[in-house]
Amino acid sequence: MNQISINNVDYIYSDGFEALHDINMSIKKGERVAILGPNGAGKSTLFNMLNGIISPTSGEVKINGLDTKVKKNLNVIRRDVGMVFQDSDDQLFNSSVMQEIAYGLVNMKVSEEELQSRVKWALNVVNMDGFEKKSPHNLSGGQKKRIALASVLAMKPEVLVLDEPTVSLDPRGTIKLVKLLKKINEEMKITIVFSTHDMDIVPLFADKVYVLNEGKLILQGGVKEVFNNKKVLRNINLRLPRVAHLAEILKSDGCIEFDELPLTIGEIRKCIKNLKGGI
C-alpha cells in the first residue's frame, strides 16, 4: 500500500481559481520526493492537503489509507504528517526552544517524563542540544530551521513535508540541512516530501520527482528521467542543476561527449576520469 495516495485531485478556491487539476501521485514509505514547479504551480496548495489543512474540491488524498476528507481521521493524519513551513518565523511562536518543541506534545497530552524525553531526543537529532532555554527568535536562520524541524520530529511523524527547506540558508547551511534530512530519512525511515527551487539539491537528495505547472502535473519519474526533459523544464522557467548545464556547454563546444547527463559534481568527475583515464 502507498503511504500517500493522491487520486484525481482538483482544488478550486472560493474565487473560482483552479489551483490543482486532476493530480495523481503515489508515494511509498521511506521515499524522498521532490515537488518542483514555478511560483503559482500549486505546490503549497498540494502540501496543505497532505495533513488536512484543506480538502480537495474533488478526488481524494489518503495517508496510510485514511481519507483526509473524513474529519475523524484528522488527528491521526496530523500526527503522522509533520509540516515544516518555508519561513521558520511562521512556525516558531513560543518564548523558548523548550516550549516550542513541547507545544505539540502538550496538546497530545503525553506524560511529563515522555515530553522531556522527546524534547531531548529531537534536539539531539538536529544537533541543537543545550538550546532549551534560548529564545527561537534570537537564533540564526539555519538554527531556526532546525528548531522548527525538531518541533515536528518530537511528534514522531511518519512523513515530513517541507516547503522550500533551504530557502534563506547559505551554501554551508544548505549542505548541513540536506545531510541532516538524509540521515533522518535513512535512520528513521521517515518519508520526506519537499518543494524547492534549488535544482542542485534535487539529485543529491530526491529519488522521485513530480513537476507541477499551472496546477497540472506535467512530469514525473526518477531524477535523471525528469532532468533529461530539458525543454519541458525550461519552458516553465526551471533550470537544470548547474553541473548538468556545464555538461551541456562542454558537449556543445565539442570538449566532452557524455553518455548520459551528469547531475552532480561526483557524477561529472567520474565521467571525466573515465574519459581521460584518470586525473
UniProtKB/Swiss-Prot annotation:
Keywords: ATP-binding, Cell membrane, Membrane, Nucleotide-binding, Translocase, Transport. Its main location: membrane. ATP binds at residues 37-44. Its EC number is 7.-.-.-. One of its GO terms (molecular function) is ATP binding. One of its GO terms (cellular component) is ATP-binding cassette (ABC) transporter complex. One of its GO terms (biological process) is cobalt ion transport. CDD domains: ABC_cobalt_CbiO_domain1 (cd03225). InterPro entries: AAA+_ATPase, ABC_transporter-like_ATP-bd, ABC_transporter-like_CS, ABC_transpr_CbiO/EcfA_su, Co_trans_ATP-bd, ECF_ABC_transporter_ATP-bd, P-loop_NTPase. It is a peripheral membrane protein. It is found in: Cell membrane. Pfam families: ABC_tran (PF00005). Gene3D superfamilies: P-loop containing nucleotide triphosphate hydrolases. PROSITE patterns: ABC_TRANSPORTER_1 (PS00211), ABC_TRANSPORTER_2 (PS50893). It is an enzyme of class 7 (translocase). Residues 4-239 form the ABC transporter domain. Belongs to the ABC transporter superfamily. Probably part of an ABC transporter complex. Responsible for energy coupling to the transport system. This is Putative ABC transporter ATP-binding protein CA_C1368. It comes from Clostridium acetobutylicum (strain ATCC 824 / DSM 792 / JCM 1419 / IAM 19013 / LMG 5710 / NBRC 13948 / NRRL B-527 / VKM B-1787 / 2291 / W).
